């Protein structure tokens, strides 16, 4: 609190000083800081339920020995390197395209148009990465005039967005995991964090760039284990009919 001095005449002829208090002015914004805010009552429509996926759409491929390897290592060699560390090969190779929350009515519908969208589509598998506790290969949809003649490879993004748009238009509920497009290769769940981080930096994964080309054979709609008493079940499966010679 600021104080000012003022002269006051004294009866004894001497000059004395008295102090007059002056209040400091406060800005309106500071006063608002202490105003109690009123909150409206919570309404049912204000609540949102986080729905977990029940099924996923995936593409499957032929035997890995049939895949075209342009550079890097075959997968059986990778598994041989990881075996002493406790790495477990995945039971099947696939790429997940979408996560869905499906009802019994949804499961009775036709998902075959997805196979049409993937006609004459190839995927490139490249760059080993550690995704949570799994060794994966990044995946990209590609266009290449002739993969066997080392023609330029163009990474495109057309079929998968089309599939997701079609699912939304059909009224299906999509779940966004935030994970990049990938193919799981080996489970490293039994390893500690230090060993997992060491594996991903091993020279065998970094010396030569990994590049493989795979052609999808079928589209599956599969139930997630947690939503089906821990059992995975293929609900629908549709073959992908590529053009002859593709």
Swiss-Prot record:
The keyword Transmembrane does not apply. One of its GO terms (cellular component) is host cell cytoplasm. Residues 1-28 are annotated as: Disordered. GO terms for biological process: symbiont-mediated suppression of host cytoplasmic pattern recognition receptor signaling pathway via inhibition of IKBKE activity; symbiont-mediated suppression of host NF-kappaB cascade; symbiont-mediated suppression of host type I interferon-mediated signaling pathway. It is found in: Host nucleus; Host nucleus, Host nucleolus; Host cytoplasm. Residues 19-28 have a biased composition (Basic residues). Plays a role in the inhibition of host innate immunity by inhibiting the interaction between host IKBKE and MAVS. In turn, this inhibition prevents the production of host interferon beta. Additionally, inhibits host NF-kappa-B by interacting with host KPNA4 and thereby preventing the translocation of the NF-kappa-B complex into the nucleus by this importin. This is Non-structural protein ORF4b.
């Amino acid at each position: 609190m600021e104080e000012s001095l003022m002269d006051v005449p004294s009866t004894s002829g001497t000059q004395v000083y008295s102090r007059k208090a002056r209040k400091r002015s406060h800005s309106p914004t500071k006063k608002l800081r202490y105003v109690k805010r009123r909150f409206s009552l919570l309404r049912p429509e204000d609540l949102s339920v986080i729905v977990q996926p029940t099924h996923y759409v995936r593409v499957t491929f032929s035997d890995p020995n049939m895949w075209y390897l342009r550079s890097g290592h075959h997968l059986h060699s990778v598994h041989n390197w990881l075996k002493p560390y406790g790495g477990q090969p995945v039971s099947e190779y696939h790429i997940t395209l979408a996560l869905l929350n499906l009802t019994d009515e949804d499961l009775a519908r036709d998902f075959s148009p997805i196979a049409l969208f993937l006609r004459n589509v190839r995927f490139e598998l490249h760059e080993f990465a550690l995704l949570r506790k799994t060794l994966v290969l990044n995946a990209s949809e590609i266009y290449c005039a002739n993969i066997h003649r080392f023609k330029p490879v163009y990474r495109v993004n057309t079929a998968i967005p089309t599939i997701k748009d079609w699912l939304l238009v059909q009224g299906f509920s999509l779940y966004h995991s935030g994970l990049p497009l990938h193919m799981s290769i080996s489970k490293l769940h039994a390893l500690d964090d230090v060993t997992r981080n060491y594996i991903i930096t091993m020279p065998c994964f970094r010396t030569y760039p990994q590049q493989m080309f795979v052609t999808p054979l079928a589209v599956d709609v599969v139930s997630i284990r947690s939503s089906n008493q821990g059992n995975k079940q293929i609900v629908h499966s549709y073959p992908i009919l590529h053009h002859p010679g593709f």
